[in-house]
């Protein structure tokens, strides 16, 4: 056992790194304790960088494509709307808004069960099943002929897609350390933005097939996107490894490096058996609900913006085909800014302040959408401002929670709980954009939602800072804590919350 100094501690005086990962900062200590750097652990910095490069080379494009296809299948209903779907299916009143919202009913209900099952079922099987099932559902959506059929298809699609994001996020936490997560989960949310850009470009091309084979262009949109997803689902079974230490894309040397990393993170990863204690701990943790409520506001904007952006731009007076390509640069900006923000948060080990800064842009954007109803140029510019923070806020907040929850089953439950509460915002988002062309109710609701989320991020920063201070005092006053051991969970005094 190492005894701890009883002298006053200060963050600037040094830092302790756990064996959980060579780069994970756990708690700041007094200057009587020698900091353990990356070079003192089993892997050198060059070895670590080499390993991460090999992992990212295969995993990054794989998860990006999977989530891009999923978000494309989910949000292409917006492209189909401006391409004539409501008229062809004779939708009346608020039936389209119901179609947009009902997806999230089954999506919410099945997120948590799917995530908790992933480790038992095995990642490659679970992910392949999810992708193939939602792709087939998307294909069948192209053959719907009335409101009832489309309603059923959207309910099934919600069930099939429910586990994809939490399973991918959880899978990444099994491979990457807490401070390495931000840019990796960034790939997922960047994909959601890119799906809008790709969806607009793809829709612009496919809608020219209107009438081919007797099918409307929006039907071809669903059919072709579903076929692409099906191919991806089959491929992922052979690409994603269940055991990363035996991954086919790692050399023998890199496999050995990965084994060392996993041994160093053993306490967090060893949960081979289901742990009800971890599940219960997630449900009783105050900060999980703080993350979930702030994510609810972020996702209200995300789902409203990503689903109805074509309709919002169409309401400015542009033609159906023009709308499809006008959405592309807006989505690309959203993806680019989110990736940049995630790398900044990873570099400086801060999430909250970047979330707050990012949210300023959509707050201004929604104000412009409400205040400048008769100026098309300003309205279109406002869409760019919204895209800057909409994707950044939703993505970084999930990363923030993932980095501050441990061990495995508590993290799995917390991610699922956060997303279940947050994704219920999709039901709200589907209902607020119902009064074209100005969509005042939608923009006002989104403005209020993102403002409240920003306030909650501020509260969360102060809460976590207070908890870190308490942990630091506990370490400074204890003479029995073994610093050579990993934190058992995020409540452990050696576990430092990322702000």
UniProtKB/Swiss-Prot annotation:
<dbReference type="GO" id="GO:0016020">
    <property type="term" value="C:membrane"/>
</dbReference>
<keyword id="KW-1133">Transmembrane helix</keyword>
<feature type="transmembrane region" description="Helical">
    <location>
        <begin position="187"/>
        <end position="207"/>
    </location>
</feature>
<keyword id="KW-0812">Transmembrane</keyword>
<feature type="transmembrane region" description="Helical">
    <location>
        <begin position="51"/>
        <end position="71"/>
    </location>
</feature>
<protein>
    <recommendedName>
        <fullName>Uncharacterized transporter C1002.16c</fullName>
    </recommendedName>
</protein>
<feature type="transmembrane region" description="Helical">
    <location>
        <begin position="444"/>
        <end position="464"/>
    </location>
</feature>
<dbReference type="GO" id="GO:0022857">
    <property type="term" value="F:transmembrane transporter activity"/>
</dbReference>
<dbReference type="InterPro" id="IPR020846">
    <property type="entry name" value="MFS_dom"/>
</dbReference>
<dbReference type="GO" id="GO:0051286">
    <property type="term" value="C:cell tip"/>
</dbReference>
<feature type="transmembrane region" description="Helical">
    <location>
        <begin position="127"/>
        <end position="147"/>
    </location>
</feature>
<dbReference type="GO" id="GO:0032153">
    <property type="term" value="C:cell division site"/>
</dbReference>
<feature type="transmembrane region" description="Helical">
    <location>
        <begin position="325"/>
        <end position="345"/>
    </location>
</feature>
<dbReference type="InterPro" id="IPR011701">
    <property type="entry name" value="MFS"/>
</dbReference>
<dbReference type="GO" id="GO:0046943">
    <property type="term" value="F:carboxylic acid transmembrane transporter activity"/>
</dbReference>
<keyword id="KW-0472">Membrane</keyword>
<keyword id="KW-0333">Golgi apparatus</keyword>
<keyword id="KW-0813">Transport</keyword>
<feature type="transmembrane region" description="Helical">
    <location>
        <begin position="98"/>
        <end position="118"/>
    </location>
</feature>
<dbReference type="InterPro" id="IPR036259">
    <property type="entry name" value="MFS_trans_sf"/>
</dbReference>
<feature type="transmembrane region" description="Helical">
    <location>
        <begin position="378"/>
        <end position="398"/>
    </location>
</feature>
<feature type="transmembrane region" description="Helical">
    <location>
        <begin position="220"/>
        <end position="240"/>
    </location>
</feature>
<dbReference type="GO" id="GO:0005794">
    <property type="term" value="C:Golgi apparatus"/>
</dbReference>
<dbReference type="GO" id="GO:0005886">
    <property type="term" value="C:plasma membrane"/>
</dbReference>
<feature type="transmembrane region" description="Helical">
    <location>
        <begin position="352"/>
        <end position="372"/>
    </location>
</feature>
<comment type="similarity">
    <text>Belongs to the major facilitator superfamily. Allantoate permease family.</text>
</comment>
<dbReference type="Pfam" id="PF07690">
    <property type="entry name" value="MFS_1"/>
</dbReference>
<feature type="transmembrane region" description="Helical">
    <location>
        <begin position="412"/>
        <end position="432"/>
    </location>
</feature>
<feature type="transmembrane region" description="Helical">
    <location>
        <begin position="155"/>
        <end position="175"/>
    </location>
</feature>
<dbReference type="GO" id="GO:1905039">
    <property type="term" value="P:carboxylic acid transmembrane transport"/>
</dbReference>
<feature type="transmembrane region" description="Helical">
    <location>
        <begin position="301"/>
        <end position="321"/>
    </location>
</feature>
